């Protein structure tokens, strides 16, 4: 139907006839001449219709926004002074000779040039219109290019693209599963996979050696800006390769990706940081190194302090008292500090103590704070010395269980960095390593695997697990972090049955439960499982970062809302009673 894309028409086509197809982006009538900006996936070109061709001109008068058109015309240079340097086709225009109205269109729910005035709900309900916007097209094109680049790298390095099942069994760890009832096995359910974790391990046991897959995963969890109920992973697994090999390989993959797509040279090698150091300095295991703010431990300075808010956590083995030094922060108003206090409350903090530093040379007299009267001179001097605070600075404090302090001050650090324009404009990748094997849940009073229960501990003998404090065990896990976002997480896996059973026991999974839930894995481990490991990257997050989008919804063609709903199709929806009966299901509405 066409000879050229709209965005490809150029001065090399001067005096040639072209046939174009696309949407009417804008129509203007100037002095009896009609101008239509015709748009397709590749861009936009100006088409001119003059009254010398009455039939074509009459059709052009009927055109409105988003009409689908086919135009045959001749390319000519724009008159002097009317060129548009901001448009790739801005030196030329097409004189319309024939016009076909392929399809009219209702008035769009929002103007494509004014989408910011439309709420996200409207954009998602009319996603097929929203995706016509150039920035959305560019993001999806970037996603396709990123995906292609990653595939090429892995293909070149001997990886096999192998699909794993979408219908599998429910997993006991992690987020809630999406369940699929089985018609042929009434009362039984499949689960949509949260990841291909066990299947990719089984592929290594089957001798596939190097596997990858760009795969959809599903988690029924609370949503945030970087979460969706269905999302895409780049999943990788290798045999006979330790953590050093996997990290080196995937670093090279990311360096090539950024160089090819963004013309950005990432560092070689990526820096590394232990989990304990990351939590101590940044309150997060995915620190944004572009922000020059750090946490400082001050619990040891609270020995003689009777202020229970500080003294209690300082004496608690699971507690922490930390300071966050903010250069120039003394200028924050009371209202701003109150807002930050409310902000950290979302993370469980009961308050936000602070000291404004007016003149540290004057000691207490040069400080301003409601908590000064509760602190000893030694504590105050130690805080000033350790934070290296100067005149005009501010020091925030967190005192609680270590998890609360880390979550609250870690989030506050990031917010302050953005609010005070401290974020450096650069790419700062990082490997976080030496993760704890387990984390203790205060509410449940039990251990959970920090990554997943198939991660190998940093010991070779299962007997060593019983001799050590489980909370002190270190795993062979590693996360790739970029600008405060976890791009990927991986580990060396357990490849011996006795080690896997020992880890299950530490997690409170007895032999019968392990056999019922993971019998197929335990059996496979008895048939010559090779040492293996891997990593999974969140493709949506990666594209979001590389395109500068505000959320992963902006880099997905058809995302769900914050309530896990599809406004376009009105999913999820009730189903016919006959379908439920066929599945042996009955709906019980939750009581109000």
Curated annotation (Swiss-Prot):
Cellular component per GO, a single term: cytoplasm
CDD domains membership: AspRS_core, EcAspRS_like_N
Keyword Nucleotide-binding: yes
Sample GO molecular function, one term: aspartate-tRNA ligase activity
Site keyed Important for tRNA non-discrimination: positions: 30, 81
EC number(s) recorded for this UniProt protein: 6.1.1.23
BP GO terms, sorted: aspartyl-tRNA aminoacylation
First-listed, main subcellular location of the protein, grouped into a coarse class: cytoplasm
Protein name: Aspartate--tRNA(Asp/Asn) ligase
Lineage of the species this protein comes from: Bacteria, Pseudomonadati, Pseudomonadota, Gammaproteobacteria, Chromatiales
């Amino acid at each position: 139907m066409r000879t050229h894309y709209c965005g490809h028409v150029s001065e090399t086509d001067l005096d040639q006839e072209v046939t174009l197809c696309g949407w009417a982006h804008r129509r203007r009538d100037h002095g009896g001449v009609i101008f239509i900006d015709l748009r397709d996936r590749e861009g936009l070109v100006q088409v001119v219709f003059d009254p010398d061709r009455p039939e074509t001109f009459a059709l052009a008068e009927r055109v409105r926004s988003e009409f689908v058109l086919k135009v045959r015309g001749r390319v000519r240079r724009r008159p002097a002074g009317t060129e548009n340097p901001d448009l790739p086709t801005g030196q030329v225009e097409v004189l319309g000779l024939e016009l076909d109205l392929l399809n009219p269109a209702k008035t769009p729910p929002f103007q494509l040039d004014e989408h910011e005035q439309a709420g996200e709900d409207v954009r998602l309900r009319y996603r097929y219109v929203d995706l016509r916007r150039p920035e959305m097209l560019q993001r999806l094109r970037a996603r396709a290019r990123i995906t292609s680049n990653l595939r090429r790298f892995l293909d070149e390095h001997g990886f096999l693209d192998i699909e794993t099942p979408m219908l599998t069994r429910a997993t006991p760890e992690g987020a809630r599963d999406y369940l699929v009832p089985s018609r042929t096995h009434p009362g039984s359910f499949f689960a949509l996979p949260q990841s291909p974790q066990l299947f990719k391990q089984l592929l290594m046991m089957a001798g596939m050696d190097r596997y990858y897959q760009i795969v959809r995963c599903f988690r029924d969890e609370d949503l945030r800006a970087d979460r969706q109920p269905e999302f895409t992973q780049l999943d990788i697994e290798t045999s006979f390769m330790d953590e050093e090999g996997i990290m080196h390989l995937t670093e090279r993959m990311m360096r090539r990706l950024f160089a090819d797509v963004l013309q950005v040279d990432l560092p070689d090698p990526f820096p590394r940081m232990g989990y304990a150091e990351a939590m101590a300095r940044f309150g997060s295991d995915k620190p944004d190194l572009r922000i020059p703010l750090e946490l400082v431990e001050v619990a040891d300075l609270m020995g003689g302090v009777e202020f229970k808010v500080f003294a209690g956590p300082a004496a608690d083995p699971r507690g922490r008292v930390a300071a966050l030094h903010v250069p120039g922060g003394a200028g924050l108003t009371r209202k701003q500090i109150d807002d930050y206090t409310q902000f950290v409350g979302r993370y469980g903090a009961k308050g936000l103590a602070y000291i404004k530093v007016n003149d540290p040379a004057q000691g207490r007299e040069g400080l301003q704070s409601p908590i000064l009267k509760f602190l000893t001179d030694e504590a105050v001097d130690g805080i000033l010395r350790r934070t290296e605070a100067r005149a005009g600075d501010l020091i925030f404090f967190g005192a609680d269980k270590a998890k609360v302090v880390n979550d609250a001050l870690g989030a506050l650090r990031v917010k302050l960095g953005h609010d005070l324009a401290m974020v450096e404009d650069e790419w700062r990748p990082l490997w976080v390593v030496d993760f704890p094997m387990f984390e203790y849940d205060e509410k449940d009073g039990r251990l959970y695997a920090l990554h997943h229960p198939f991660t190998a501990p940093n010991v070779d003998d299962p007997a060593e697990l019983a001799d050590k404090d489980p909370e002190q065990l270190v795993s062979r896990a590693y996360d790739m972090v970029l600008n405060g976002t976890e791009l990927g997480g991986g580990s060396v896996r357990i490849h011996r049955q006795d080690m896997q059973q020992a880890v299950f026991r530490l997690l409170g999974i007895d032999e019968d439960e392990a056999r019922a839930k993971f019998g197929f894995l335990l059996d496979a481990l008895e048939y010559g499982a090779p040492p293996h490991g891997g990593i999974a990257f969140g493709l949506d997050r990666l594209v979001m970062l590389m395109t500068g989008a505000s959320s992963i919804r902006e880099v997905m063609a058809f995302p769900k809302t914050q309530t896990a709903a599809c406004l376009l199709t009105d999913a999820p929806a009730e189903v016919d009673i006959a379908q439920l009966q066929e599945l042996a299901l009955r709906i019980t509405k939750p009581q109000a």
